[in-house]
């Protein structure tokens, strides 16, 4: 299904691919019946709201790989083509506000009926070679080009406003960083893992993969996912770690909860984040079944990745002897992580796993140092200042942040057997973090190594 508004006459298209001469004529009747069945009960208002929120968020965040300038040019041309106003689709707040007002009026039901219950223009394309008398015929389509009366130049853009400086403050036991911005709102929570043991970080990494499958006292896992899809653009819990630029190159590790959303839904974001992190049921029969299911799937996925990306796993494994960041990467996503998964699956003591998750949640969410990063407007910041102190994120006192550490093991020569039919031989040297060396390594991989090993050597 597609909607094309890049032409003077916008079109709504329903395309059935892979149809046969027998099934193609039944397509229009099937669409009519499906629409009739849907209109019998009406389009659910919560689904319409979720769709509108998702579309509005996409119009602000611009997902995908196209540069914002290219998208703005397309939107400006489309708005100018249909309405004479190039700026209409560049500022969509009024457009979506008017659509939200129509949610409870039945307007969307009437629109669906008008578009899809009317007799459609149906085209059935049957592949065939062109006939001789068609090869020299005039083209059925004549392309034209619209000309702008007043094309913009770089001079029309001006210098633009400089970004406002960020601010730091203490709020509800957390360090709040505000980065002034317009458009979508980004709210990230960073719980410090400096006081965690290596094994605890492994359990936390598993927990972030399992949370989506677990219920809360208020919602089932599926209901909570629907709520997140309705009110948030993106939301994700994960382990983040990196080597800092401070003296000694410390490794910083955080449990992160990231959300992107429309500013008016900030109250929903705080409520959903609190429920997802603090109230998820980590014990009981349903949770234990989810543990076994998710970990078994993860084990299978890793075994497939060993075959497809054995070189990457070998590089991580070898580099783990030289830096804490690499050691932690190996611990949560490398061969060590795979062995940890196998051990848990072999023991199958899911009650103990749930108890471990509960203890870690208490330790981190209520006591670890918390940094809240807020990208949004001043009005949004004022709203956050009111919401955060009364939420589950608030604590009277928290610990201080510190670097994550673990003891590095001495380098060893290792070999692993995988059923991939490809051998990987990896050599690793310790190297201080240096931009010039990174450039040299990239040049070698593109030039010398690629040519001499891949092309000349035939590897």
Cite the ranges covered by each PLM segment.
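Short, hydrophobic beta-strand segments
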Residues: 10-18, 187-189, 209, 255-257, ...
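Terminal end segments
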Residues: 413-416, 428-442
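Active-site-adjacent "gating/activation" loops or surface patches in catalytic cores
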Residues: 1, 161-202, 419-421, 451
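Charge-rich, well-structured scaffold segments of protease-associated domains
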Residues: 1-160, 226-400, 456-459
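Short, low-order "capping/linker" segments at domain edges
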Residues: 59-63, 409-424
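Pyridoxal 5′-phosphate
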Residues: 405
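Active/ligand-binding-proximal structured segments within catalytic/core domains
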Residues: 183-227, 273, 434-444, 453
């Amino acid at each position: 299904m597609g909607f094309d508004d890049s032409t003077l006459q916008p079109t709504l298209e329903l395309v059935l691919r892979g149809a046969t001469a027998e099934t193609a004529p039944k397509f229009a009747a099937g669409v009519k019946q499906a629409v009739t069945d849907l209109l019998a009960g009406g389009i659910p208002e919560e689904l319409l709201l979720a769709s509108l929120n998702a579309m509005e968020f996409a119009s602000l965040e611009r997902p995908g790989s196209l540069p914002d300038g290219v998208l703005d040019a397309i939107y400006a041309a489309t708005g100018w083509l249909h309405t004479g106003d190039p700026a209409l689709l560049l500022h969509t707040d009024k457009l979506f506000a008017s659509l939200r007002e129509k949610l409870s009026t039945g307007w969307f039901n009437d629109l669906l009926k008008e578009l899809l219950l009317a007799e459609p223009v149906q085209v059935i394309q049957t592949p065939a070679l062109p006939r001789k008398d068609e090869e020299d015929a005039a083209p059925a389509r004549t392309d034209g080009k619209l000309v702008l009366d007043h094309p913009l130049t770089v001079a029309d853009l001006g210098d633009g406003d400089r970004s406002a400086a960020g601010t730091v403050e203490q709020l509800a036991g957390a360090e709040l960083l505000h980065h002034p911005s317009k458009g979508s709102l980004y709210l990230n929570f960073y719980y410090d893992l400096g006081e965690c043991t290596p094994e605890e970080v492994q359990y936390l990494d598993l927990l972030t993969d399992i949370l989506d499958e677990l219920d809360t006292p208020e919602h089932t896992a599926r209901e909570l996912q629907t709520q997140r899809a309705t009110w948030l653009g993106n939301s994700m819990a994960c382990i983040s770690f990196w080597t800092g630029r401070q003296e000694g190159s410390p490794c910083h590790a955080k449990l992160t909860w990231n959300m992107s959303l429309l500013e008016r839904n900030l109250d929903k974001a705080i409520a959903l984040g609190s429920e997802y992190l603090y109230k998820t049921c980590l014990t009981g029969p349903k949770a234990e079944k989810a543990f076994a299911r998710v970990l078994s799937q993860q084990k299978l996925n890793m075994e497939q990745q060993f075959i497809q990306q054995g070189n990457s796993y070998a590089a991580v494994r070898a580099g783990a002897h030289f830096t804490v960041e690499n050691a932690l990467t190996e611990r949560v996503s490398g061969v060590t992580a795979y062995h940890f998964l196998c051990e848990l699956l072999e023991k199958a003591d899911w009650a103990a796993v749930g108890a471990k998750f509960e203890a870690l949640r208490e330790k981190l969410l209520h006591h670890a140092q918390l940094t809240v990063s807020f990208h949004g407007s001043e009005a949004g910041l004022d709203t956050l200042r009111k919401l955060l102190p009364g939420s589950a994120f608030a604590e009277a006192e928290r610990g201080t942040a510190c670097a994550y550490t673990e003891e590095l093991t001495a380098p060893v020569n290792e070999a692993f057997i995988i059923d991939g039919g490809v051998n990987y031989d990896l050599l690793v040297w310790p190297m201080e973090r240096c931009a010039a060396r990174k450039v040299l390594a990239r040049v070698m991989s593109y030039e010398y190594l690629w040519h001499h090993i891949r092309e000349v050597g035939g590897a």
